[in-house]
Amino acid sequence: MAEMKESPTVAPAGTFERRVPEGDSQSRLVCRDCGFINYENPKVVVGSVCTWGEQILLCRRAIHPRSGYWTLPAGYMELHETSADGARREAWEEARASIEIERLLAVYNILRLSQVQLIYRARLLSPDIAAGPESIEVGLFDWGAIPWQDIAFPSVRWALDHYHSAAGRADYPVGSNPPGEWGNYEPGL
């Protein structure tokens, strides 16, 4: 295995080249001057299926991609927070919703975007919700009223379906991508 170099304080533009470091099998960004390897890793997305009784919280996106489409409160995990703390933060940022995390619902791998999504099952502490800066509007939906044709991403549909199939069960298995599905959608929409 190649010797691990410490991160340079500031790497001047253009000093990294893409190559397979000695002892590795993947193409990496390697500093030409010091040999530091800048590992590019998947991004972690955290979110939750939040409920108030039988109703599910959805947020209509005010940002791209998929502006105007409905999603779960979710977003990128921040440094120095747990995944559950990130899911709580995202619920507040997108829907001004205070939630109690109940249990991990699903883990999805979105290969095209190099994402790992951790989706929790959560309970709203109050039905008082409001659109945050990244949402046009928010709403509580009965299962039959979910705007399925306007769902933003395949993983949102998967999470909702898994939540519905696990409803009332404490021992449900953690969900994952449906066989052969990797979360592709039309990014230009």
Where are these regions (language model features)?
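Short capping/connector residues at structural and topological boundaries
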Residues: V49, G75-M77, T82, I110, ...
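Hydrophobic alpha-helical segments
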Residues: A74, A87, S114, Y120, ...
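Glycine-rich active-site/cofactor-binding loop and its immediate structural neighborhood
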Residues: T71
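N-terminal leader/linker segments that precede catalytic domains of diphosphate-processing enzymes
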Residues: M1-R66, Y76-E93, A97-D128, R169-L189
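Nudix hydrolase/Nudix homology domain
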Residues: M1-K5, P133-L189
